[in-house]
Swiss-Prot record:
Organism: Burkholderia orbicola (strain AU 1054)
EC number assigned by the record: 2.7.1.35
GO biological process per UniProt: pyridoxal 5'-phosphate salvage
Protein name per its UniProtKB record: Pyridoxal kinase PdxY
Keywords for the protein's UniProt record, in alphabetical order: ATP-binding, Kinase, Magnesium, Nucleotide-binding, Transferase
Class of the enzyme per the UniProt entry, highest EC level: transferase
Length: 286
């Protein structure tokens, strides 16, 4: 069974960061080692919250503890999400380097989380660090539209421009770019677009876009987690992309149908493992 070290935020109530990522990856047959960068009562969009960030040095100490008992070499991948400060971002990068030193086959997937995540905004300097330092180390990245623009340093309005930006990013290091949400001026307003790009191939997929009164938090964290889990279990990029598109849709639909604000992960767990509605992905020659 594959193992992933997941470095993200955590909420006690609700689903954001590791609280949105751990269970879906486990449901897909992956062992998850969660390292919480932030521990909060709930995500901040409720307007009231309690909690704090973990010290960057403690992040590295915790991973050193795993290494000391001889299991870090069994880590197959690192997934990083919200990193609240430049020291946390640097610590995450050092952790990735440590994992790769112990297991050269381990890979690193970065969900850049450069904007507001669950009401939390990273400190100044995090965005610049991710843009400048992380691509060279990452094997895959999962920006949303805004984050892709920041990583590419350009405005993106079409699928062709998005593919070109992803390829430019791939030339800096990553092998796979998963665009969690792509705004395309040529797409219907009621569709949600995702994009997966490698050096030689690109696929686009669409699912229904639901009109929530308040959009649930954690959908991006869920998206990255499912994609990573599918890749770890051996799915091709296209198969992982299609499964992610279908499984995330199932969770979002269950949440919408239940008129809930928090993602219905438990209620939709069978759909995460075996989606009943598939949308497919088509090759784009952009």
């Amino acid at each position: 069974m594959k193992n992933v070290l997941s470095i993200q935020s955590h909420v006690i109530y609700g689903h954001a960061g590791n609280s949105a990522a751990v269970f879906p990856m486990q449901r897909l047959g992956i062992n998850v080692w969660p390292l919480n960068t932030v521990q909060l009562s709930n995500h901040m969009q409720y307007g009231h919250w309690a909690g704090s960030a973990i010290d960057a040095a403690k992040m590295e100490q915790l991973v050193d503890g795993i290494a000391a008992i001889g299991v870090l070499k069994r880590c197959d991948a690192v997934l990083s999400g919200f990193l609240g400060s430049p020291p946390q971002a640097r610590a995450a990068v050092e952790i990735v380097r440590t994992v790769k030193a112990m297991n050269p086959n381990a890979w690193y997937f970065c969900d850049p989380a450069m904007g507001q995540t669950g009401g939390i905004r990273p400190e100044p300097g995090v965005e610049e660090f991710i843009v400048e330092e992380v691509p060279a180390l990452a094997d895959g990245m999962s920006p949303n539209h805004t984050e892709l623009q920041k990583l590419a340093g350009r405005r993106i309005e079409t699928v062709a421009e998005a593919v070109d930006a992803c390829r430019a990013l791939i030339r800096r290091g990553p092998q796979i770019i998963l665009v969690k949400h792509l705004h395309d001026r040529n797409s219907p307003a009621d569709r949600f677009n995702m994009l997966a790009v490698t050096e030689t191939e690109a696929w686009i997929g669409q699912r229904p876009l639901y009109a929530f009164p308040r959009h649930p938090v954690g959908v991006g964290d869920l998206t990255s987690a499912i994609f990573v889990a599918c890749r770890l279990r051996g799915d091709s990029v296209r198969a992982a992309f299609e499964h992610t598109l279908a499984a995330v849709h199932a969770v979002v639909k269950a949440t919408y149908d239940a008129r809930r604000y928090e993602l219905e992960l438990v209620a939709a767990q069978d759909e995460i493992a075996r989606p009943s509605e598939w949308f497919g992905a088509w090759v784009t020659d952009a």
